[in-house]
Amino acid sequence: MGDWEFLEKLLDQVQEHSTSIGKIWLMVLFIFRILILGLAGESVWGDEQSDFTCNTEQPGCTNVCYDKAFPISHVRYWVLQFLFVSTPTLFYLGHVIYLSRKEEKLKQKESELRALDDKEQVEQAIAIIEKKKLKLYIQEDGTVKIKGALMYTYLTSVIFKSIFEAGFLLGQWYLYGFVMTPIYVCERVPCPHKVDCFVSRPMEKTIFIIFMLVVSLISLFLNVLELIHLICKSMIHALKKYSQYIPANRYPKNEDTYPEKTSETATAPFQDKSYIYLPMNENISYPQYKMPNEQNWVNFNTEQQLAISGNTQSPLGHYSLSAFLPVSPKTHSTVEKASTRASSSASKKQYV
């Protein structure tokens, strides 16, 4: 009775900490496998060896032929399959129990810290404990979220369950096939020749074999479906976690690419300026103007000639003082007229 209570608690733990597909798989495992196998397996396969007869009186021939026909009993083979398939789930359940015990220790330590008087140290220690609790992914009602290391454990258990299911299906096909033949031809020592052996209730056993085959295929399908579900869930969680690190305005919209002109952009390094574009032509002719220094030399030579003509006695090299002395109005007007004429003639020569 105590063993059944322990098994019931174990099943409750597995049911509580599994996905929806995992719960369906567990129901298929225990209802359609263990229950059916326990109730009908014994009645169908109870006379498996006693009713296996061969048409020979050679001692030991029937036993060796039975051993060759059935290396392992179907019922024992299915029990072994159940043990292998359920073992990864037990490992996952052990991880869940470990996390639950760890959370209980953290809660106990937190309650002990709250009883202390030093508030600062207590708050720091409680903050550290809360961070550790968050890493355990345990909710307030005691259920564990399948995240982090627990997700990898659950994913590994589903992978191994799928491998075991497929392996046992291949093993059953290799050992027995999926149809129970009524006559088995045996040729083995110590049988003197080929011996015909007869199986009891072959049709009933064939139906039972096909039923267990369908249950195994359903279990394998659920495992593969749950594996795809977990992989998609992990990818979505990783994408959401990655999108949190990308800034929202990393890629601005087209209308936000170029900011509007405001007073704040007056000191920007690049400002909009208006330019006048002149048409360019290869045959453009520009007027010939003298440079300012050439014009100054012309004016200087003209004034020098006027000074020489006005005062022949004092050359240019000896009138340094008289050149800066005040001139009478009459003389000034004469010089001005002469300079005007000279400049006009020079201008005419220039433009000619």
From Swiss-Prot:
What is known about the tissue distribution of this protein?
Expressed in ovarian somatic cells, heart, leg muscle, liver and eye but not in brain.
GO BP terms in the entry: cell-cell signaling
Which InterPro entries does the protein's record reference?
A: Connexin (IPR000500), Connexin_C (IPR034634), Connexin_CCC (IPR019570), Connexin_CS (IPR017990), Connexin_N (IPR013092), Connexin_N_sf (IPR038359)
* Sequence segments annotated as region (Disordered): 332-352
Task: Kindly report every residue range on the membrane side named Extracellular.
Answer: 47-76, 177-208
- For the keyword Magnesium, the answer is no
| Topological domains, Cytoplasmic | 2-23, 100-153, 232-352
Listed transmembrane segments: 24-46, 77-99, 154-176, 209-231
Protein family per UniProt: Belongs to the connexin family. Alpha-type (group II) subfamily.
Q: What protein does this entry describe?
A: Gap junction alpha-4 protein
Record the organism.
Xenopus laevis
